[in-house]
């Protein structure tokens, strides 16, 4: 009788241990961290690695007048709609597939898009950065659960812009077509490449 009780205890203990081991396995931990951690420290650390991500446009793309004006509302002292501005865009691995999907992309949680805002096409020194982070469901469902951030030219300060409604209103028209991501730079890049092919 005692042996049967001991055997049951051993079986139950093994079962519980297997569940715990599975839950805390390295594979499971890898899938939930650090890519889906949104505390300011880990998020900043990921953003600062953006140069190792996929470069979306091979060359800086000239911003449209609409985009320049929208960004001017965020950083008026630097960006002016009266001067040409260029952007260079990077996307992390989580958002890469959605970025290049032709129709109705859905960016997964943890996707990050970094835009370098350049004063000239040949500039290597961005004057500031705008950032989109796809947050967890329910973070801001009205605006597609995207978090909008800016980063100064020194990369030392990452924060939400004071006039965040400017970012939200700029991206709102793209909610049904590309999950609030304009991807205008992809189309501009494509037209530039087509022109180069025709000229050859």
Where are these regions (language model features)?
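Disulfide-bonded cysteine motifs in exported proteins
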Residues: 9, 17, 66, 162-165
């Amino acid at each position: 009788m005692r042996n049967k009780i001991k055997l049951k205890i051993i079986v139950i203990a093994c079962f519980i241990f297997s569940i715990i081991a599975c839950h805390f396995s390295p594979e499971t931990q890898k899938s939930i961290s650090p890519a889906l951690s949104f505390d300011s420290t880990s998020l900043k650390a990921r953003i600062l690695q953006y140069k190792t991500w996929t470069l979306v446009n091979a060359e800086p793309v000239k911003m449209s007048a609409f985009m320049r004006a929208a960004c001017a509302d965020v950083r008026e002292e630097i960006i002016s709609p009266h001067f040409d501005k260029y952007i260079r865009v990077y996307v992390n691995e989580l958002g890469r597939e959605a970025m290049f999907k032709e129709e109705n992309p859905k960016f997964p949680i943890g996707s990050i898009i970094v835009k370098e805002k350049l004063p000239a096409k040949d500039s290597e020194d961005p004057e500031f950065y705008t950032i989109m982070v796809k947050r967890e469901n329910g973070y801001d469902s009205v605006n597609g659960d995207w978090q909008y951030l800016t980063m100064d030219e020194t990369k030392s300060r990452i924060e939400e812009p004071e006039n965040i409604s400017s970012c939200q209103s700029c991206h709102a028209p793209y909610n049904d077509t590309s999950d609030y991501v304009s991807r205008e730079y992809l189309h501009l890049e494509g037209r530039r490449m087509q022109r180069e092919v025709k000229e050859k």
